[in-house]
Amino acid sequence: MSDILPLDVIGRRVEVNGEYATVRFCGAVPPVAGLWLGVEWDNPERGKHDGSHEGTMYFKCRHPTGGSFVRPNIVNFGEDFLTALKKRYVLTDGPDDDEKSCSLKVGSKQVQTIGFEHITKKQSQLRSLQDISLWKCAVSCAGERGRIAEACPNIRVVDLSKNLLSTWDEVILIAEQLKDLEALDLSENKLQFPSDSPTLTRTFSTLKTLVLNKTGITWTEVLHCAPSWPVLQELYLKSNGISISERPVNALQNLRLLDLSSNPSIDESQLCLIAYLPRLEHLLLSDIGLSSIHFPDAEIGCKTSMFPALTYLIVNDNQISEWSFINELDKLQSLQALSCARNPLTKGDKAEEIIIAKIGQLKTLNRCQILPEERRGAELDYRKAFGKEWRKAGGHPDPDRNRPSAEFLSAHPRYQLLCCKYGAPEDEELKTQQPFMLKNQLLTLKIKCSNQPEQQILEKQLPDSMTIQKVKGLLSRLLKVPVSELLLSYESSKMPGREIELENDLQPLQFYSVENGDCLLVRW
């Protein structure tokens, strides 16, 4: 804290008793004597007014209680980069030598920060530092030009999140001294970005990862700055209130990951503006209020030219409630992984199974690998579940008579393909099951592992409507054996010694006349 004010005090980021704010006013506030700073708090609940006092407006706040007047001597204006770096990383013989180290992420890269507990003699020398974290160190400026480059020229990864940086120009003054800079996290610095494209320099010529979460940047400002990031691969823009206002032309063309999560102004029409980034593989759209998406260039069963390289899509915590959303995702030519947790659509027990059936090339769902037998089961169940609807809409096992309606094909774009893959559902499969009656439909069966004589014979009660596929799934969990390796047959208590194979996974136990007291034989 100091009574000496910076020359450019208006717009400066400051910290007061652990709370962060931006200086909006400096001067007298009559009738109280002395110098005052008018600040707008990041947390509006911390303030008392909207920037006015006794009828006079001294500055404006976005929130009616976002402002306060404070004395300069209680305000922390921060310190330069190198001073903060030395405080954190230079080895000392003081009582706090055993400060903890911590693990953090800068973009998708895991970084082990160097606490005093892990510092070696070599690492204590600033020149040897490569990955650093100055999180919450009150860094506000670059300091004397050239000193950073001289003291620590080998830094590649920098976490400057939650500091007191005020402008993008100040960031440039730091970055231009780090010639090998690859990853930079500036999250939670309320930065003033240039309103026009800055002069192109080589400042960020090696930068691959840039994190700008909660910085207040707009999409227009992103595009103004982007030409200065020629090799950028990962860009994080979470929680900025961003609206995508224009298509990136000659900018962000090397981008592989884009995080737009928690920007509720983004909708499906805006996503079309970033749909032709040629190398975009990962797109993070969690918590933006998304409910629909549409790729108008692709008909049913065709692939879109939009998002050509997209392999991983995250749409957690949105408002997705219609299966048409999932149908559209099957049009993405490269999509292999999807995360869509905590959406209205995914609350049902069968939701994940239906998603697997609807998106043919999907290999990972909600961070879980989709095994071949799981896909087969999901597709067979889907084919059976909508078989009656398919028949009513004009579907037929005879190819010459198979003419399902356009409405059905729109709702179930992959159904015809599944019929080609597994065959059309048979009449027996589509019969309505009789109402469940516990007394005559619950079978008590013995389960014997034929090629594992040491295995104890089990006894289970199973519904006679349970399909062979579901029985295999149950046995797979009980015996810790993959479903694909299980072979099932049974011996009837009425015909000892005769073994009947259960070869059709889609048929229920009752189809094979399995009865109470019979024995299921399991091999693998």
From Swiss-Prot:
Return the InterPro entries for the record: CAP-Gly_dom_sf (IPR036859), CAP-Gly_domain (IPR000938), LRR_dom_sf (IPR032675), Ubiquitin-like_dom (IPR000626), Ubiquitin-like_domsf (IPR029071), Ubl_TBCE (IPR044079)
* Residue positions, PTM Phosphoserine: S492
Q: Which GO terms describe its biological process?
A: adult locomotory behavior; axonogenesis; developmental growth; microtubule cytoskeleton organization; mitotic spindle organization; muscle atrophy; peripheral nervous system neuron axonogenesis; post-chaperonin tubulin folding pathway
Domain LRRCT, residue spans: 343-381
Question: Where in the cell is the protein located?
Answer: Cytoplasm; Cytoplasm, Cytoskeleton
Map the LRR repeats onto residue numbers.
Answer: 154-175, 180-201, 206-227, 231-253, 254-273, 279-300, 309-330
One of the entry's Gene Ontology molecular-function terms is:
alpha-tubulin binding
Name listed for the protein in its UniProt record: Tubulin-specific chaperone E
The organism's taxonomy opens as: Eukaryota, Metazoa, Chordata, Craniata, Vertebrata
